[in-house]
Amino acid sequence: MSATPSRTPHLDRVTGPADLKAMSIADLTALASEVRREIVEVVSQTGGHLGSSLGVVELTVALHAVFNSPGDKLIWDVGHQCYPHKILTGRRSRMLTLRQAGGISGFPKRSESPHDAFGAGHSSTSISAALGFAVGRELGQPVGDTIAIIGDGSITAGMAYEALNHAGHLKSRMFVILNDNDMSIAPPVGALQHYLNTIARQAPFAALKAAAEGIEMHLPGPVRDGARRARQMVTAMPGGATLFEELGFDYIGPVDGHDMAELVETLRVTRARASGPVLIHVCTTKGKGYAPAEGAEDKLHGVSKFDIETGKQKKSIPNAPNYTAVFGERLTEEAARDQAIVAVTAAMPTGTGLDIMQKRFPRRVFDVGIAEQHAVTFAAGMAAAGLKPFLALYSSFVQRGYDQLVHDVALQNLPVRLMIDRAGLVGQDGATHAGAFDVSMLANLPNFTVMAAADEAELCHMVVTAAAHDSGPIALRYPRGEGRGVEMPERGEVLEIGKGRVMTEGTEVAILSFGAHLAQALKAAEMLEAEGVSTTVADARFCRPLDTDLIDRLIEGHAALITLEQGAMGGFGAMVLHYLARTGQLEKGRAIRTMTLPDCYIDHGSPEEMYAWAGLTANDIRDTALAAARPSKSVRIVHSA
C-alpha cells in the first residue's frame, strides 16, 4: 500500500530560509499556499493573530528567498504578522505551542531564534531598529542588509516618521517594506505597476516617478484614476514627489503583495542596485486566502480557537460581563447625562470598549491612530478647554505617552481621566503587553489620583467618580477579561477620594489589596481562618492618595500587614512603605510584606499560569501571611514555574 501523499510537499523540504534559494517561482508560490494552510490549521487550535499573518505569506516567502537571514536582518513591526516567518525559520514543529506556557512567542523574540533580529509587540519601532543595525554594519559589525517590515497603520505613528527622517539624513543602505493592507489595486493598475517596475529595473530609481507620470497621461480615464489612487497615499509633495522621496528614500511601488514573481523580482533588483535607503510599497490583503477572514470586518485579526470550516470562534460562555464592556457601557451612560464628556483612543476603539460610545455619540469619540503621545496631550488640551476627556489606553501602551502625562497633564493639574485597560498580566500576549508598570509610573506624580477596580461593580463606581473629578488628573486601572459576577449597581456612586473599605474583620493578619486581586486575598483569608489565623481583608481602592487612616488602623490592630497588587515593585506597596517610614510606624514591631510582580518579565501563558509563576495565587498569599504572622511555624512557599 502506498503512503498518503503529503499535503505540504514544498514546506516539508524547508528546514530554514536557505532551502528557498533554489526554488522556482512556481515552487515558491506553492510553498506560500502550504504555509497559509498551515497557519490556519495552527491558529485554529491555539488562537492568535490570524489575519495579519495570512496577509504577508507571499511577502515573507519572497523576503526569505531573496535575503539571507539571519545575516540579513528582517525586522517585523509589531510582530502580529510573524507566523509565516517562524514557520520558515525552523520553528514549524513547535507552532502548536504558539502563545502557550513554555511554547514559542506570538511575537518575534531575540532569545527564541537568531532569525528574530529584534523583538516586537508594540508598533512603529522597526525602522529605528533597522537603521541601528545599518549603522552597526557601517561601523564594522557583522550585519548584512537590514529590512524593516511595517504596516500602513504603524507607519502613521510619530516614531516611524522620526526614524524615516533620520534614515534619509544618514543615507544608510536599508530597506523599508511598507505593508499596505488597506488598499485594493484593480488588475489594470497591477499590470501598470508591473510595467513601471520593469522600467525601474532598467533605469535609475529617480526615473520611476517621471515614467509613471508619463504613462498615466496616456491611460484610459478609469485606469488612470486607479493608478493615481494607488500612489495617492504617498504622493503629496510639491512637484509630485512622494513623502518618502522628500525624506531621502528611493520609492518603489505599489507592488502586488500576492504576486510572487513580481515580489521576488522587485526585491532582487532593488537589493542589487540600492546604495541608500529604499522604501518598497507592497499592497496586501489582510486575511488573504481564508474566506472567513477576508469576509470578517476585522479580518480575524486576533482570534481564539475556531472552526476551520466556518471561522466561528470557540469562546467559552462568560460567567460575568468583562471589564472592558462594563467600562464602555457605563461611560456611554455618563456621556448621555453630561455633554462635556468626550473619549479618546489610540487606534483601539473596540479593544478599549469605546466603540460602544462611538456608536451612540460618534462626534464625541476620537480615534487618533497609533499616537499615544498626541492622544495624551490632545486630551489635556480638551481638559483645558473645559471638556471632560476620558483617555482609554492599554496599560502597556500608557508607557508610550509618559512624558506627556508628566509634563502636559500632571504638571498643569489638568483633569484628564486616564482609563487603563489590561492592567496586570494579560496572558498569551506575554511580556510585551503586560500591564505591570502603570502604578509605579503614575503613583509618584504630584496631582494624580490613582484608583484600581477590585471587581466590575467597583469599576462602575469608579467611572462615575472619574466623571465627577474635576480637580486634577485621575487614573483608573482594571484587568482584561470577565469580572467576578458580583451584583451590579443600577448606577455607580461617587466614591470618597482616598478612602478604602474593609471586606472582612480579623485580629492577627491584615491583607491590604489594591485592585482585582482582592478575590485572591479573600480566598487566602478563608484558608488562614481555617488554620486559626484571624484575618482582615481590606480593599484600598486608591493608591494615591492613600487611605492613611485605614493603614494606621491595620498596623495598630494586627501583628502582620501584607500589601497585594497586580503590578511591579515601586507601586502600591512601596507607597504604603513610604508612608509607614515617614510616620515612624516601621519601628512598631509589625511584620510587613509587599506582594508584587517579581523583578523580571514574565513570558506568555494563561493569566492563571502567569500569576502562579509570579507567586501571587491565594496559596502564595496564605503562605506569605502565615510566615509573617507566625514565623516559627514551618511554611513551604512554592512559586510555580
UniProtKB/Swiss-Prot annotation:
The keyword Methyltransferase does not apply. PROSITE patterns: TRANSKETOLASE_1, TRANSKETOLASE_2. Its EC number is 2.2.1.7. It catalyses: D-glyceraldehyde 3-phosphate + pyruvate + H(+) = 1-deoxy-D-xylulose 5-phosphate + CO2. Binds 1 Mg(2+) ion per subunit. Binds 1 thiamine pyrophosphate per subunit. GO terms for biological process: 1-deoxy-D-xylulose 5-phosphate biosynthetic process; glyceraldehyde-3-phosphate metabolic process; terpenoid biosynthetic process; thiamine biosynthetic process. Thiamine diphosphate binds at H80, G121, H122, S123, G153, S154, N181, Y290, E372. It is an enzyme of class 2 (transferase). Mg(2+) binds at D152, N181. Pathway: Metabolic intermediate biosynthesis; 1-deoxy-D-xylulose 5-phosphate biosynthesis; 1-deoxy-D-xylulose 5-phosphate from D-glyceraldehyde 3-phosphate and pyruvate: step 1/1. GO terms for molecular function: 1-deoxy-D-xylulose-5-phosphate synthase activity; magnesium ion binding; thiamine pyrophosphate binding. InterPro entries: Dxylulose-5-P_synthase (IPR005477), THDP-binding (IPR029061), TPP-bd_CS (IPR000399), Transketo_C/PFOR_II (IPR009014), Transketolase-like_Pyr-bd (IPR005475), Transketolase_BS (IPR020826), Transketolase_C (IPR033248), Transketolase_CS (IPR049557). Its cofactor is Mg(2+); thiamine diphosphate. SMART domains: Transket_pyr. Keywords: Isoprene biosynthesis, Magnesium, Metal-binding, Thiamine biosynthesis, Thiamine pyrophosphate, Transferase. It holds the Pfam family DXP_synthase_N. CDD domains: TPP_DXS, TPP_PYR_DXS_TK_like. Homodimer. Belongs to the transketolase family. DXPS subfamily. Catalyzes the acyloin condensation reaction between C atoms 2 and 3 of pyruvate and glyceraldehyde 3-phosphate to yield 1-deoxy-D-xylulose-5-phosphate (DXP). This is 1-deoxy-D-xylulose-5-phosphate synthase. It comes from Rhodobacter capsulatus.
